[in-house]
């Protein structure tokens, strides 16, 4: 019976000592707690479910998205791939032709050189 009388006050005080045990939800990018009233040194930033206030410590600068440093895509030291990508071509234009195309062109050119048939007139 004495053990029960000791355990009962411990179970009543435990939620007040450990905030996570009392079931307070995290809010404002997990930097605040949903409470009925904010404690000293906390500021209300938003409202939670069940008409509770999202309380965050007022002495810190809190943002919705934590500041992160940009991640470089690759290191800036030049390598073999950089050399390959910066090669400039000297040939701007070239034409590919086949033997068949050359034969067709030569036949088309000769078409105007054909002679007219001889026409004989009788008197």
Curated annotation (Swiss-Prot):
<comment type="similarity">
    <text>Belongs to the beta-defensin family.</text>
</comment>
<dbReference type="GO" id="GO:0007283">
    <property type="term" value="P:spermatogenesis"/>
</dbReference>
<keyword id="KW-0732">Signal</keyword>
<dbReference type="GO" id="GO:0031640">
    <property type="term" value="P:killing of cells of another organism"/>
</dbReference>
<keyword id="KW-0165">Cleavage on pair of basic residues</keyword>
<feature type="signal peptide">
    <location>
        <begin position="1"/>
        <end position="19"/>
    </location>
</feature>
<dbReference type="GO" id="GO:0001530">
    <property type="term" value="F:lipopolysaccharide binding"/>
</dbReference>
<comment type="function">
    <text>Host defense peptide that exhibits antimicrobial activity against both Gram-negative bacteria, such as E.coli and S.typhimurium, and Gram-positive bacteria, such as S.aureus and B.subtilis. Inhibits cell adhesion of E.coli on intestinal epithelial enterocytes. Causes rapid permeabilization of both the outer and inner membrane of E.coli, leading to morphological alterations on the bacterial surface. Binds to bacterial lipopolysaccharides (LPS) with high affinity, and may thereby be involved in immunoregulation through LPS neutralization.</text>
</comment>
<feature type="propeptide">
    <location>
        <begin position="65"/>
        <end position="123"/>
    </location>
</feature>
<feature type="disulfide bond">
    <location>
        <begin position="34"/>
        <end position="48"/>
    </location>
</feature>
<dbReference type="GO" id="GO:0061844">
    <property type="term" value="P:antimicrobial humoral immune response mediated by antimicrobial peptide"/>
</dbReference>
<protein>
    <recommendedName>
        <fullName>Defensin beta 118</fullName>
    </recommendedName>
</protein>
<keyword id="KW-0044">Antibiotic</keyword>
<feature type="region of interest" description="Disordered">
    <location>
        <begin position="100"/>
        <end position="123"/>
    </location>
</feature>
<keyword id="KW-0929">Antimicrobial</keyword>
<dbReference type="GO" id="GO:0042742">
    <property type="term" value="P:defense response to bacterium"/>
</dbReference>
<dbReference type="GO" id="GO:0050829">
    <property type="term" value="P:defense response to Gram-negative bacterium"/>
</dbReference>
<feature type="disulfide bond">
    <location>
        <begin position="38"/>
        <end position="55"/>
    </location>
</feature>
<dbReference type="GO" id="GO:0005576">
    <property type="term" value="C:extracellular region"/>
</dbReference>
<dbReference type="GO" id="GO:0050830">
    <property type="term" value="P:defense response to Gram-positive bacterium"/>
</dbReference>
<dbReference type="Pfam" id="PF13841">
    <property type="entry name" value="Defensin_beta_2"/>
</dbReference>
<keyword id="KW-0211">Defensin</keyword>
<dbReference type="GO" id="GO:0007162">
    <property type="term" value="P:negative regulation of cell adhesion"/>
</dbReference>
<dbReference type="GO" id="GO:0007160">
    <property type="term" value="P:cell-matrix adhesion"/>
</dbReference>
<dbReference type="GO" id="GO:0140912">
    <property type="term" value="F:membrane destabilizing activity"/>
</dbReference>
<dbReference type="InterPro" id="IPR025933">
    <property type="entry name" value="Beta_defensin_dom"/>
</dbReference>
<dbReference type="GO" id="GO:0045087">
    <property type="term" value="P:innate immune response"/>
</dbReference>
<dbReference type="GO" id="GO:0031665">
    <property type="term" value="P:negative regulation of lipopolysaccharide-mediated signaling pathway"/>
</dbReference>
<dbReference type="InterPro" id="IPR050544">
    <property type="entry name" value="Beta-defensin"/>
</dbReference>
<keyword id="KW-0964">Secreted</keyword>
<feature type="disulfide bond">
    <location>
        <begin position="27"/>
        <end position="54"/>
    </location>
</feature>
<keyword id="KW-1015">Disulfide bond</keyword>
<feature type="compositionally biased region" description="Polar residues">
    <location>
        <begin position="112"/>
        <end position="123"/>
    </location>
</feature>
<feature type="compositionally biased region" description="Basic and acidic residues">
    <location>
        <begin position="100"/>
        <end position="110"/>
    </location>
</feature>
